[in-house]
């Protein structure tokens, strides 16, 4: 466990860049005073923001580059233009060199996954990365992966996701044997694609000591909190994520419209304002910002590109916790216990945007 948690930030990533990243880092520092920051990007944009946060400035070092990966770049374009020189690559390279414990970026998802895979390389036994995030549930929280790092995958890939997701959940939720379910169209063993059924059979027969496989989970089971970890391939996972985020926004819009519809409803809102505040905190996607890119020889966290300073700070919080509680070692231990079960998966397609 490091004395200080060294966090490399892609200060040019996201819709706004340094204007969100620097204030977000300042918020995160107020929660984690033992953090230090490496800020990669255009110093002309970083320094004025940094001057407004003296405490952050005292524990930060700016590494200048005027090359940034745009939100429109395809992964192949980002690698051609930004390899070795972009703020995103340099943040990842700091982790590779041991200068930072974790890299955080709000930049282009596909580019980040491709660069991270190319720069940090994959863990032994893992063929492709996965995006994992915390999801609010009726009971508490759960980890869902893959949320779109790659598309498709065979049974071995799903088993690898289960192993990595279990390690992540054990760190986040302090559970030595978190429950794991495979996302499927039904809970019966005959339901779903062949690779899902095979993965279920493998997980059940392996009976891994570090995770408790409970079987198939339907889409509504995520919100019910039926498992600590929900495993799916990236295409379905990304659709589930976007659908859930859209449902939350729709619900909040409908609620606001209903409150404004009559003076009686507005009085009711005033009386129940505290309960509404708790509800918003519980379901606001901003409060769950920060997806971990699993499967790499290093810790990388992806922040939502449109997040505000508080949202970006949440992503930094996730990276801090992953480094502080040594996620990489836990994943390696889990994979080593699995032995030969994690065979290479087919070549992955590009990340979902």
From Swiss-Prot:
Gene3D superfamilies: Isopropylmalate Dehydrogenase (3.40.718.10). Pathway: Lipid metabolism; phospholipid metabolism. Signal peptide: none annotated. Keywords: Cytoplasm, Lipid biosynthesis, Lipid metabolism, Phospholipid biosynthesis, Phospholipid metabolism, Transferase. Belongs to the PlsX family. NCBIfam families: plsX. Homodimer. Probably interacts with PlsY. This is Phosphate acyltransferase. It comes from Bradyrhizobium sp. (strain BTAi1 / ATCC BAA-1182). The gene is plsX.
